[in-house]
Regions:
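C-terminal leucine-rich, beta-strand-based interaction scaffolds used for sensing/assembly
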Residues: 115-192
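Sensor-1/coupling segment of RecA-like P-loop NTPase cores
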Residues: 1-28, 34, 38
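Helical mechanochemical/support elements of P-loop NTPase systems and associated helical scaffolds
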Residues: 16, 48, 81, 127, ...
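Amphipathic alpha-helical "lid/sensor" segments that cap RecA-like P-loop NTPase cores
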Residues: 49, 53-116
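Conserved nucleotide-binding/hydrolysis micro-motifs of P-loop NTPases
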Residues: 15-19, 43-45, 89, 187
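Short, flexible helix/strand-to-coil boundary loops that buttress conserved ligand/catalytic motifs
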Residues: 23-24, 52, 86, 176, ...
Length: 192
């Protein structure tokens, strides 16, 4: 019973932004107005490079800053996936890491996740899938007739519903400037 705890501070965090906002901002939820909401920025590439390179060095293995950066870039600085890819790369490295090792680890990680991603896709409509593919392809102007036709999204009025549905499923984030981004970088790569 959290209500009875005294002199305690809690930090609840996660990458499912829509779900977290709902938990703390929805009147019907148990944590309504429970505390402050802070949006943290992603860890910067340069910090990942230093961290990954140092962790390899700490265990007697070598990885160049370029390859450490490649790991962070492939995972778009997403903390969970950057650490997963780093671990998979580290496990495959005996002494010195190569680009081939990073790529092998990346492909293996995507392969491990493919069943999960297939289950996600199976829960979506064909237009929701097409919308996600368009987002993964970097589309920003969804009202363009060419885009609507190419991705078979229906009418421009349908875009609002597609955004809402995929946002509620925590598949996308809508960033400042109304930029749409797929939350999961591994899922985004898999979609392509």
């Amino acid at each position: 019973h959290w209500q009875t705890h005294t002199s305690v501070c809690y930090c609840l965090y996660g990458s499912k932004r829509h779900m977290l906002l709902s938990i703390f901002n929805d009147y019907s939820m148990p944590f309504y107005k429970f505390g402050d909401i802070l949006f943290l920025q992603k860890i910067e590439r340069k910090d990942w490079v230093a961290f990954i390179s140092q962790r390899f060095a700490d265990t007697g293995k070598q990885i160049s800053d370029e390859l450490s950066g490649m790991i962070a870039d492939k995972m778009k600085n997403h903390p969970y996936y950057t650490q997963q890819l780093s671990q998979q790369t580290w496990l495959r490295t005996s002494k010195e890491c190569s680009e081939a090792i990073v790529n092998e680890a990346f492909n293996s990680l995507i392969g491990q996740l493919s069943l999960l991603f297939t289950n996600i896709i199976d829960s979506l409509t064909s237009r929701q899938i097409s919308f996600l593919i368009a987002v993964a392809d970097g589309v920003v102007n969804f009202s363009s007739k060419d885009i609507l036709k190419h991705y078979q999204l229906g009418t421009s009025a349908n875009i609002k519903n597609l955004k809402k549905a995929t946002l509620e499923k925590d598949l996308i984030d809508i960033l400042p400037g109304n930029t749409i981004e797929i939350q999961d970088p591994a899922f985004e790569y898999w979609l392509k």
